[in-house]
A protein has these predicted regions:
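Short, surface-exposed linear motifs at loops/turns and structural transition points
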Residues: 21-134, 138-147, 152, 160, ...
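An edge-strand/N-cap motif at the start of beta-rich repeat modules
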Residues: 37, 48, 129-145, 154-155, ...
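Conserved short beta-strand element of beta-propeller blades
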Residues: 48, 63, 214-241, 249-251, ...
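Predominantly a core beta-strand signature of beta-propeller blades
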Residues: 74-76, 118, 161, 210-213, ...
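Hydrophobic core positions of the immunoglobulin-like beta-sandwich fold
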Residues: 92-93, 98, 144, 164-165, ...
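Repetitive beta-architecture junctions, highlighting loop-to-beta-strand starts
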Residues: 245-247, 257, 288-290, 335-337, ...
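Short loop/turn segments that connect beta-strands within beta-propeller blades
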Residues: 252-257, 295-299, 342-347, 385-389, ...
């Protein structure tokens, strides 16, 4: 059909070239559909041509588009009046994707409509290429790349519809990630175009975690160092140093959200090794002490026999009836690399070996039973298996250096709030991988002076780095939104 149309066009043109130019009568005109020069999911661009030996009065010309060759109820591309022969271009941008169409040129002269032979074409189906980022907070911009995407496309994150903020050239859609439905934190990303649904292979994952202010801390607002630990559902913070040593603790009852003063009948100490239920070692600012403190079920401090070593800033884990003590510094200021274990039943200490790393309470640590994890100054993560006495290097921590604290909830470890950072990270024990969580309120340079972990929540004590603003206790729920 296209070949026959072109033959007619050239024959008609040849007739005009060899015809007499002496007459001034208005010429006859023919119209041809030439080439489909562009087609996508919803856009068609096509050229046509009016052929005439002279001027001609055309009241309208353009193209007709239809899904049927009979052109019943066609889409009209009207290009208006015309008086001279030549090429013309038409465009239409609201076609259905993945559909077969017919297009033909037309002109109207002397009240009569002439049409060309039809050209058949097909619009393209929408395709998805990728999207980024694949891990982000709700409300942030997500960019979707594809082909033949239409302006009326809809984007869904799981069951939630996203708001489209920008559409570019059928190839890019920018959306705001919607708030997730309850429990839907790893969701498919679907793009619906003309009723056709395309789904990305990789799920989108929300950065989740809920921070909220739980209480204001009643201690001295000017303190810069303290001793903190937890015991039987209560949080302990004390031994504050704000220029003058404070020889007491504040206890926080999580269930009632109340603080109470707790007298301490021992000497003032800083930088001890702390664990869930007490602390040991440290310094009284003049020398390293060998004190060892536990708490009974009523929360009273009990002085155990002195430890057989002198350490500050050691790392301690209580697992069952055993207390493991790692690293720290000795009385000469040198890094200690010993691993010790104390049994609360036999009251005996033993040395288990040495560590291949340098660690202290200045660096984050956490444990999953007898498997203990340590971050180094360079953010390397090491695991110690107390059952086998083996060390293994794991996935490096991706956050800022200088992070503190550390805790375990379920199958995940938590570390964060490094130097000038409000980021919290979650470590997956099974996958050996890190994932960012929601940032804590406040300022990047706020100081973290306490970290406590319960069965399903983390409590963090934060204070401004400058001035004497009150410290605040924040609660973090890692699986909430």
């Amino acid at each position: 059909m296209r070949l026959l149309s072109r033959i007619k066009y050239f024959l008609f043109l040849s007739l005009f070239l060899f015809s007499s130019c002496e007459e001034e009568l208005e010429s006859e005109a023919l119209v041809f559909a030439e080439d489909v020069i562009f087609v996508s999911g919803e856009i068609l661009r096509i050229t046509g041509r009016v052929v005439s030996s002279g001027t001609v009065t055309i009241t309208d010309h353009g193209f007709q588009i239809s899904e049927s060759p009979e052109f019943s109820s066609p889409i009209i591309i009207s290009l208006g009046e015309r008086s001279i022969p030549g090429r013309f271009i038409g465009s239409y941008g609201e076609l259905s994707t993945g559909t077969d169409f017919f297009v033909r040129a037309f002109l109207i002269t002397k009240g009569e409509t002439s049409v060309s032979e039809a050209i058949e074409f097909s619009t393209l189906d929408p395709e998805l290429i990728d999207y980024a980022p694949v891990f982000e907070e709700a409300g942030q911009t997500i960019t979707i790349n594809g082909k033949n995407l239409t302006v009326d496309s809809e984007v869904f994150f799981g069951s939630q519809r996203a708001t489209i903020t920008e559409f570019n050239n059928e190839a890019e859609i920018k959306v705001r990630a919607p708030n997730p439905a309850v429990g839907e934190y790893s969701v498919s990303v679907r793009v619906i175009t003309d009723g056709k649904e395309n789904v990305f292979d990789k799920n989108f994952e929300y950065i989740i975690g809920k921070w909220q202010l739980d209480s204001n801390y009643p201690g001295d607002p000017g303190f810069s160092r303290n001793v903190y630990f937890q015991h039987e559902g209560k949080l302990y913070s004390g031994m504050e140093d704000a220029g003058t040593a404070v020889q007491l603790f504040w206890t926080y009852d999580i269930s009632t959200k109340t603080w109470q003063k707790k007298d301490f009948n021992g000497p003032y100490v800083v930088y001890p090794g702390v664990y869930n239920g007490g602390f040991l070692g440290g310094t009284d600012t003049n020398s390293i002490v060998k004190n060892f403190w536990t708490l009974d079920q009523s929360g009273n401090f009990i002085a155990e026999a002195d430890v057989p070593f002198r350490l500050v800033q050691s790392v301690s884990f209580k697992v069952g009836d055993d207390l493991y003590v790692f690293g720290g510094q000795n009385e000469f200021g040198a890094n200690n690399n010993s691993i010790r274990k104390y049994n609360f039943v036999s009251k005996e200490w033993i040395v288990l070996g040495t560590m291949p790393i340098v660690t202290s309470s200045r660096f984050p640590s956490f444990n999953l039973g007898n498997q203990m994890y340590f971050l180094t100054v360079s953010n390397d993560l090491w695991k110690y298996d107390a059952n086998t006495s083996q060390w293994e290097q794991m996935a490096s921590y991706p956050g800022a250096t200088g992070a503190i604290g550390g805790g375990t909830i379920g199958d995940f470890g938590y570390v964060g709030l490094g130097n000038n950072s409000r980021e919290m990270f979650e470590y997956d024990f099974v996958l050996d991988s890190w994932k960012r969580k929601t940032i804590i309120p406040g300022f990047n340079n706020d100081l973290t002076l306490g970290w406590f972990t319960t069965d399903d929540e983390i409590f963090v004590l934060r204070k401004p780095s400058r001035g004497t603003g009150a410290s605040k206790l924040y609660k973090f729920e890692p699986f909430n939104f």
